[in-house]
Regions:
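Phosphate- and other anionic-substrate recognition elements at nucleic-acid/protein interfaces
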Residues: 1-71
Length: 71
């Protein structure tokens, strides 16, 4: 089973892809996506969306987990 975990953020968004195996969980990919502060909000969201789509296309996760935002 492949799991995509997302730590949401507008400026910095964390992503990790884990593979659940009988012997335990294995980290197969992680990154921090950083949008440019000078770009308009819609352009920043578009960038983050495109990058997440690339990750989904490459790793084909079975499950998505999104961390709850705390303010």
């Amino acid at each position: 089973m492949i799991i995509l975990g997302i730590d949401p953020g507008f400026e910095k968004l964390g992503c990790a892809v884990l593979k659940k195996e009988k012997t335990g969980d294995k980290l197969i990919y992680s990154t921090c996506l950083i949008s440019k502060k000078k770009d308009p909000h819609e352009q920043r969201l578009l960038y983050l969306g495109k990058e997440i789509r690339k990750i989904i296309k490459k790793y084909k996760p079975d499950i998505l987990s999104v961390e709850k935002l705390f303010f």
